[in-house]
A protein has these predicted regions:
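Gly/Pro-rich hinge or "lid" segments in bacterial periplasmic/extracellular proteins
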Residues: 93, 187-242, 246
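Extracellular/periplasmic solute-recognition and catalytic clefts
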Residues: 220-230, 248-313, 319-320, 332
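N-terminal lobe/hinge region of extracytoplasmic solute-binding protein
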Residues: 54-111, 142, 212
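Detector for C-terminal structural segments
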Residues: 29, 34-39, 325-356, 369, ...
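Ligand/substrate-recognition segments at binding pockets and active sites
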Residues: 224, 378-454
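Alpha-helical secondary-structure segments
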Residues: 54, 133-140, 170-174, 216, ...
Length: 565
């Protein structure tokens, strides 16, 4: 019988419970079994190995527009070669070859008016699905002929019209004059459908990102603060897919990059090496198998004495300024005894590593004091003055861009030794090239007397000559003023020769033989050296080479492989 509110407990059950508790207490002092029991034949699966190549670089900052002077950098060249489509690319010997990834073909189809017809592949498209078409050609043409601070615009300014058919896949480009260098045009096409109406316009194009791409790789991460860019295989690319899953560009100091090569965290490096880092690489090579190659860029460091500046209109003042400079010392300061020290630039137009380069340097032996005196200046308080005003020059360089800032400070120091006062002005690159040096500003801008800036040759040296030293172009169908060259130089005595070289009426070599002596005498530019990077490659990164001239190593990244991956 059960009482209300309780239950009767049997004595036997209590005995069993006590026994169980004793057993549990006894077990609690025994060490716990191992978390992973040792089982014969069991293997631990390693962490997945990424099929990638990590490349150490000096910097990853933008802008990334390869068509602007402000965008010229190692990383811009690398990204453009992998992400943007081009009508032609450089072959191993530097000659242009049609890029069959983009085009079916391209040829001159009419002599009068001079017309080039491009046939675009039907399957060529941007990463957002939009077709690559005539509007991309039109957008680049319109911007290159009219915007300030662009690279080698002279060829684009010969184009008078662009028409299309077959849904924009057949593009006809009409020129005002014959243009033998037409193959240098329409490289690194940009997505017009995304950029033409974008906020900020051309000045903001590719400042810190790529809105769409059309190459073997696409951008996964572009993190400037962290100093890392991750490119991944573009699954939308219509041609042979890249062998790697990813290419990583990683910013570090050169000592940190050497450490990363030593540990294998980086499999390659592309850096503007100096004497110290060259020694570090030599030391590393004693214990680590590696290969190295010098990679010259399409960029020559130059000092411009700008006739556009009121204080520099007199050729004798420009001659005095350049004569006050020690070229050897400037080259040593800019190259820091790295690979570029062997690429001294003694010609005004063609860079040292390009076919057709011939040294033409003509030093002016006239003393600085004599030239300034002839220009009307007199010594005063350790300096030079004319009409009661001291000669004091502004020396500009793109802010944060080496070796230009270093060279600019050396220019200031050397001028001071001759009593010529100066100050260094470092300006954001977009502002320096797009406003201060273009001659198109509608508001007051800083007057730049001397500019330490690059001279860039994108493939057609005749266009480089016309762009750097030709007189300001005049296009009747453009309402805004066409930018002048960076120095503001114009000499009618050589202008016809410059135009004839551009249109093929005279050989470039003959034109340079006439023009370069005038350029040296006019003291407009003092070229110093060609910029060069150093490529370092470990055996883990396969098929990595210096690449075609001026294309850069990453132009071949679609064929790179990672050992054992």
């Amino acid at each position: 019988m059960t009482r209300s509110g309780g239950a009767r407990t049997r004595p036997g059950v209590l005995v069993v419970l006590v026994a169980l508790l004793a057993a549990v207490s006894a077990c609690s002092v025994t060490p716990p079994p191992p978390l992973v029991p040792s089982t014969p034949g069991m293997t631990v699966v390693p962490k997945e190995k990424l099929n990638e190549v990590v490349v150490g670089v000096d910097d990853v900052k933008g802008s990334y527009n390869p068509h602007t002077m402000a965008g010229q950098s190692t990383v811009t060249t690398a990204l453009a070669s992998l992400l943007l489509p081009s009508t032609f690319r450089a072959d191993a010997d530097g000659s242009p070859r049609v890029d069959l990834d983009l085009l079916v073909g391209a040829e001159v189809t009419k002599a009068e008016p001079y017309t080039v017809t491009y046939t675009i592949r039907r399957d060529a498209s941007w990463s957002d699905g939009a077709p690559i078409a005539a509007e991309d050609f039109v957008y680049l043409w319109e911007r290159m002929r009219a915007e300030p601070g662009v690279v080698d615009p002279a060829g684009y300014r010969l184009v008078s019209d662009i028409t299309s058919r077959e849904g924009g896949k057949v593009v006809e480009v009409v020129f005002r004059h014959p243009y033998p260098g037409w193959r240098s045009l329409f490289t690194n096409l940009l997505p017009a459908h995304l950029l033409k109406d974008a906020p900020g316009g051309w000045a903001a194009a590719l400042t810190d990102s790529f809105p769409a791409t059309a190459g073997p790789f696409a951008v996964r991460t572009l993190d400037q603060p962290r100093g890392e860019i991750i490119l991944e295989r573009n699954d939308r690319f219509w041609e042979q897919p890249a062998a790697l899953d990813r290419v990583v560009l990683r910013r570090a100091s050169q000592s940190a990059t050497l450490d990363a090569l030593k540990t294998g965290d980086d499999q390659a490096a592309l850096v503007r090496a100096d004497e110290k880092s060259l020694k570090g690489i030599d030391d590393l090579a004693r214990t680590t198998p590696l290969t190295t190659a010098v990679v010259p860029r399409a960029e020559v460091v130059q000092v411009l004495a700008r006739p556009a500046a009121p204080q520099m209109t007199d050729v004798r003042v420009r001659q005095a300024v350049l004569n006050a400079l020690d070229r050897d010392e400037l080259i040593a300061a800019g190259t820091r005894k790295g690979p570029a020290a062997e690429l001294r630039a003694d010609a005004q137009v063609v860079p040292p590593t390009k076919a057709g380069y011939q040294p033409t340097f003509q030093p002016n032996p006239t003393p600085v004091a004599q030239l300034l005196t002839e220009a009307g200046y007199t010594p005063q308080n350790g300096g030079w003055a004319r009409d009661g005003k001291q000669l004091s020059l502004t020396i500009a360089a793109p802010d944060g861009v080496e070796p230009y800032v270093t060279v600019a400070h050396q220019v200031q120091r050397q001028l001071s030794l001759s009593g010529i006062a100066g100050r260094v002005l470092t300006t954001p690159p977009n502002q320096l090239f797009g406003r201060d040096l273009s001659g198109t500003a509608t508001t007051d801008v800083e007057v730049v007397d001397i500019a330490v800036v690059p001279r860039v040759d994108t493939g057609d040296s005749a266009a480089a000559l016309a762009s750097a030293f030709g007189c300001r172009a005049s296009l009747g169908d453009v309402s805004t003023p066409i930018p002048a060259n960076l120095s503001g130089f114009c000499d009618q005595s050589v202008q016809t020769t410059i135009e004839d070289a551009l249109t093929g009426n005279v050989l470039l070599s003959d034109a340079l033989a006439r023009v370069e002596p005038v350029l040296w005498q006019q003291a407009v530019a003092m070229p110093l050296f060609q910029v060069a990077d150093l490529l370092v490659v470990l055996p883990q990164a396969q098929n990595v080479t210096a690449g075609a001239p001026f294309a850069g190593p990453l132009s071949g990244a679609s064929t790179w492989r990672r050992e054992g991956r």
